[in-house]
Amino acid sequence: MNLGLNDDQQMLRDTFARFLDSESAMARVRKANEAGGFDPALWQGLAELGTFGMRVPEQAGGLAMGTIDAALVMEEVGRTLASGPIAEAILSARLLGQLGSEALDEVTSGAKVATLAFHDMASQPIQWLPGGAHADLVIARRGDEVILVSLSPADRRIEDSLAANGIGECDLGKAAKTVLASGKAATDMFEAAMEEWKLLSAAALNGLAREAVRLAAAYACERHAFGVAIGTYQALSHPLANFITEVEGGRLFVWKVIHEIASGAATAAAQIPLALWWNAKVANMAAIQSLRTFGGYGLTTEYDIHLYNLRAKAWMLILGDPQRLLQQAGRRLYAGEIAVLPDTGAVAVDFDLGEGAKALAAEVDAFFKATLTPELKAHAHHSWDGHHPHVHKKLAEAGLLFPELSPEKGGRGASPYASFAASSVWEDHGWTGHAKGTTMMVAAMIDKFGSDELKRDVLNPILAGDIVCSLGYSEPGSGSD
């Protein structure tokens, strides 16, 4: 497993972080919002950095960078609320490069703004587009054709929105258009771009959520009430801690999906909409909680947090109800729906737990298949009620109850990765780990701090699978366990 960025990726992230901290500072974001959600100077600066050519194939003059590189850039875009259809322009340029269009140079140079149409224009010629208020070019699908649409002011209708995200309702049927390509190969490229858009949007929402929580945490350290910083109150600090954990999980979710696509995992297609749904949900809820941390100030336009709240709510609505992403994932998992996946390029991060972890997981899986009779399966429950002394004892005898312990103590000396893989198998079989988890906590404390007598009378029976332990309440009135 390797979840670290390589030197080139770290440099890429740092470069865009510095650039956007300067060129998409909140004063610039507010000014762009007044202009309908677009900053021409920022757009040109992004073009000069090579942003729009990063996913263009090398043979078309692009940088041929990977999806994960684009995701890193989009995290910074979300963090700084950078204006314009940036993910859409990156993928539009990729399509133009793949299809050999002469319009590519205009897009990568920043001379023209390009975006994507999400719906087949054959059945829906009029549709809302991300960046449609400012786009010059749109790449759309029309049946088995991929179309390049040139928009004029007469082809669009713009309505002000509180989020100032630059959406526009565009009449693609009326606008001038050119057929870029036709046939399955062309439409597959377009569909792959749509899937990659979901991942890049998920990354942007993740960056937004991370910054919203950071703003709230900083304010909670500065704001005092009753003589102390409000961040010392658990009612404020614990929700923020929960959300930054979910934000971190959202980032790893996006990276893991990219890794799964690159490695050909069977569930990769279903994971794409799930990653977007998760990050959209977390961004919305994290922004709300962060805004509430500011109290009434959070609702005023003077505080930047309200900008994050508005953008978090509006960003995904261009695609429709985010809950539909769950339906799409379900169809891909259980109904055989096929998706065309993007070529992600090289992926340095690696979520593989290793051969040792796979071997231990396979052994635990075989144990449960051999041990869990229909009666035991009926007994299974996710709570303590699912504990069964006989199965608990047999796991201990097989050295699978506490595999992280040394062989001398009845375990396997398993690595944390292997222990995690083994625990996941318990979940797969619906077998509760409550008794195991709490008992292991007590066993670890006794092993480290207990007397010889306590180890003999309590620890040894624990390791043998003869007894289980629970934790008492040290502060019953406060709910601490």
Predicted regions and their residues:
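FAD-binding core of flavoproteins
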Residues: 81-87, 94-214, 218, 228, ...
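Short, conserved phosphate-binding/catalytic loop or strand-edge motifs used
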Residues: 438-443
